[in-house]
Amino acid sequence: MKLGINIDHIATLRNARGQGNPSILRALKVCEKAKVDTLTVHLREDRRHINDNDLKLLKKNARIPINLEMALTDEMIAISKRIKPNFICLVPENRNEITTEGGLNLEKISKKKLKSLLTVCHSNGIELSAFINPNKKAIELAKKFKFQTVELHTGSLDKKKINNRDKENINNMINFASKMNLKVNIGHGLNFSNIKFIKSRKKIDTVHIGHFIISEAIFLSLHETIKKFQRII
């Protein structure tokens, strides 16, 4: 598996003081030195953490691929056309949420906007994925709507007592998506402990980690936390 690091919460910490520290460009350089495979940022409608200038700076300076998480809106489609990230992952957004609470409901998305985004992606060599719940219906819809990749929501593993049904389901859905000829990524709530429940690792392209990595970095340093996770996967 490859490792993608989400640095949104470095921007959250920076924004708490409204100045320039901690620097997202410094975080980028640490990630590159640690040989991270992908850098992920979520440009939210409310600009809660990453902002437009951050995205420009990262795209200009990054030597590793940029994965842009975004909602399916006209504004974000225009931004993606201008910035041209390497990857785009469509995610749900709710202004009142603390973090992403579940996968994107593909039945309810605008097919007109999706068609527009697919045109942007095809014209610029951008790989498009959808962040979805780990169930067959969502995976089948992703295939139907011509997504190249799915990122399966692993939040069911982020609790003190994880039941066997959740462990089995996420692994079964990884295998199911792979059989549908979709590239499979996973993310949300993963840490040093629960990543061990992911058994179908050969079917996974990239595991995306954000909040946990940044939290552990307070104690271990960002570089050492990344290296430890790489050793585990």
Where are the predicted features?
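Glycine-enriched alpha-helix->loop->beta-strand junction motifs that scaffold or abut catalytic
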Residues: 35-37, 61-64, 82-88, 123, ...
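Hydrophobic faces of well-ordered beta-strands that scaffold small-molecule active sites
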Residues: 3-7, 39-41, 66-70, 88-90, ...
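Catalytic cores of alpha/beta
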Residues: 74-84, 135-145, 184-186, 190-204
